[in-house]
Every structure is written in C-alpha cells, then in structure tokens.
C-alpha cells in the first residue's frame, strides 16, 4: 500500500532480443575484484507461468572487448505472489563505473519491485547497511551528537514532499519513494531523477548513533515547508492545525524508547532492536 509501483518485463517478440533494465547508480557503480555484492529483488509471475529466468550482470558498458560483463548470474522466478530473491555477485575485476543490468531471458512476463545491490561487507555487517569506509571515517571523528536527517530536507519542497519519519521505518521494501528536496529548486538546472528511497531511515540513523557512541538528534517537520520557495502563508500549517505534527514527535519518542508492547516500540523491536535506543 505504501509502495505500489513496479516494473513489468515481457518478451519483446523479437528473436535474440531481451527486455531489461540498466541502472548506472550515481554516475557508475564502483565494484572491486573478489568482493561480494548482494543483489536482491522482489518479483512475481503475473500471467500464469510457473518459471521465468532473469539474467543479472554488472557490466563495463565502455568495454570494446568480447564480453562486457564483470560478473553474471541467473535467477529463477517461480511464484505468482511477491517474493524476495537474492544472489551474491563477485566481480572478476575492479571497475569504478560499472552498470547493473537485469534482463528477462525467457519468453514470459515478470514483475519486479525493490531492486537492490549492496556490498556484503557493510558497516557492522548490517544487510541494509552503510558503506563501511564512510561510516568508519565518521565514527573515527568520535562525534558527541549526530543530527539527522538534516535541515532543509525535512521541510520538503512543499508539505506533501516533506520528510516523514514514519515512512522511513519498517521493512525497507515497504518504504515509499519521495522527491528529494533539491529536485526542482534551481530553475537553471533541474534534477528529475533526484529521489530518496527512505532506504536510509530513522531506524538506521538511530542505530548508527548508538554504534558510534553519539547522542542522536532527530529533526522533525514542524508544519513548515521550504520558506525559500513558499512565500504564501497557506503553504504552511496554522498553529491551530499542528496536532498531527505534535503527535509525530510523541510517536518518535515511543519508537526510540517505548516498550515493545507499544505501537511504535513494537515497530522498532520487529526491526531487530527490542531494547530502547535511549
């Protein structure tokens, strides 16, 4: 319900051709020889077939050699219901700008949702974890306070696109996509592909704070959208209508510190942290 969109791959009807997707990450996906990367995807068979095959590759799109693939493998999709499929990719060479390629090699139809590629070796070994070198560099500073997720990003371009902490917790595959605050800020340069997945959410921020030994300082929206882009007072929430925003703050306290029998304390516990973050 919170994340209803998916992509459908079907046989194109042309011999020796396949339907697929490329994802270049942020100007390329850096991978290292011999390191393991966990690929996962939620998939289903919508049209009655019992088995379809996906080809998963990390490729060097600039290569003029006979093979572009740094590593490749097949996934068998075998369920009409949404199901998580995983595989480990281990590149045979290092490349700073690889591309993740997914294509359907069989003749049926497959629906895909929540495609993910993560290093296996993350900070503290968390599956939905942080890049190890960056998190370690942050921890080495020994911060006393860790403020998250930021300032302007909490406001959103408008209230509809504000950062909502409740959408950033729970199973990562159920967290909805949101526009990034700076997607259309500068009229001379739009960033139409600038989104945030909420894959890094308040649970992950609290966990990072705890593991670094820093006091967490969560920032919440108080009913204001970006004042730089919204001069009309009606773009913001009137004082008499702030109840929902106040409740969000109270619920966050419960999420961080509440007993596992409370609504939001249970969400935290179900994510793997029954003890309060305190």
Regions found by a protein language model. Name each.
Residues 103-105, 113-114, 119, 149-152, ...:
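Active-site groove signature of glycoside hydrolases
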Residues 1-2, 98, 129-133, 199-205, ...:
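Alpha-helical scaffolding within the catalytic cores
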Residues 28-32, 137, 207-208, 212, ...:
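Surface-exposed acidic, glycine-flexible loop patches that form ligand/cofactor-binding
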Residues 198, 202-207, 211-213, 220-259, ...:
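Catalytic-domain carbohydrate-binding cleft regions of carbohydrate-active enzymes
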Residues 47-48, 64-66, 93-95, 211-212, ...:
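Secondary-structure transition/capping motifs at alpha-helix termini
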Residues 1-197, 215-217, 232-243:
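Extracellular and organelle-lumenal recognition/adhesion modules and their flexible linkers in secreted
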